[in-house]
Amino acid sequence: MFEKILIANRGEIALRVHRACRDMGIQTVAVHSTADSDAMHVRLADESVCIGPPQSRDSYLNGQAIISAAIIAGADAIHPGVGFLSENAAFAEMVEEHGFTFIGPSAEHIRMMGDKITAKRVIQELGLPVVAGSDGPAGSDDEARRMAQDIGYPVLVKAVSGGGGRGMGVVLEPESLISVMARCRAEAMASFGDDTLYIEKYLGHPRHIEVQVFGDGDGGAIHFGERDCSIQRRHQKVIEEAPSPALDAAAREDIGARATDAVRKLRYRGAGTFEFLYEDGEFFFIEMNTRLQVEHPVSEMISGVDLVRQQISIAAGEPMALRQADIVLTGHAIECRVAAEHPESFAPSPGLVSEYHAPGGPGVRVDSALYTGYSVSPHYDSLVSKLVVHADNRDECIMRMRRALDEYVISGIETTIPLHRRLLSEADFLSGDYDIHWLETRLGL
């Protein structure tokens, strides 16, 4: 087992990885920008190394600085967390080339699944269904028009290297195809340094269902059930729950088995998530995330398994201790993503947290790096807390989440807590009758 792990991330996810390491008796090294010198993960780590100025490109996205910090601290392994360099194949290779263990899948699998066209082809060969779309990138305008016509409008234009809704646009009629593609190209280049696009069929009312998987790299594979991430705004997840209120036992068992079969055939190592659109009883693969997900606590709450510990153990070369029969999913879990944003305009709200009180009680978990006196930086993602609750069933879970939201105090900045209170009182949410467009079409958000 590792003696010392460098955590190449910040905020609540860095703190989450730190806690898992502590539980395993592993020392931690925090890296931070100058803006994060007082961050909680820095305060709690055994060691910390400043890796650059506030801008992410000069600190948390600076692979060379992170490697230098690992050398200075004498770390054995590097955990990339979520976002930043967690799905960067070149960084994974750099980590291994310098003699450290990358806590994640192989660079080959990161690269394979990072290219959405390649990923769809591979997944299709493995027997999972995909959304109808182009077999290759949309090159010239004429080629794009032909592809869209063959697929049938409406279509969705997507960045090959994309994620998080960036470089993506819906095209309802042929006249707007080229202008939407131009916008998506510019956004993709700015976000990912790659303006390659592809086109696929736009589904009108799908749910977003994802399956949490693990592989040992030698053909062993397990899954932890599904999560429903359909409450979204501009392709960004707002609320996640597990299990999905839309699936019956047969559909749940089928997609879990098919996902683990794909992991087994890929000989995939570590944590991964297969994301699907689900419409009219059919699943359609959209992408595989080759890392831990922000919403992983939902799966932890219904399974009782620490997924970060599983990541670390597999990366250390230990045999996968769990088999599918060992994973018993109980009750229901919901996660509300609390962002430092105005709850109506969604304008960012950085600033000083003048008062902080987290909710508690049975079945309540808060993953946050906030504390009274902490200053929320304008330089990074606005997510400041994940409020997760677990109960015996969905109705009790909703009641518990309402109670937890009422207890939660974050003063000095605006947050989306009022939005979550509203959503948990909406009739469609209470009945489980929603899709990925619901938040925008029904509530106009």
What do the PLM-derived regions correspond to, one by one?
Residues 122-131, 153-154:
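A polyampholytic, Gly/Pro-enriched intrinsically disordered region
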Residues 1-126, 138-146, 396:
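ATP-binding N-terminal substructure of ATP-dependent carboxylate-amine bond-forming enzymes
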Residues 29, 79, 101-103, 131, ...:
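Structural detector of well-ordered beta-strand residues that form the stable sheet scaffold
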Residues 159:
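N-terminal nucleotide-binding beta1-loop-alpha1 segment
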Residues 107, 132-133:
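Diglycine-centered glycine-rich loop/turn motifs
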Residues 133, 141-143, 147, 174, ...:
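Catalytic core of soluble alpha/beta enzymes
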Residues 7-23, 48, 71-73, 89, ...:
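ATP-dependent carboxylate activation and anion-phosphoryl transfer catalytic cores
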Residues 147-156:
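Acidic/histidine-enriched active-site and ligand-binding environments that engage anionic O-linkages
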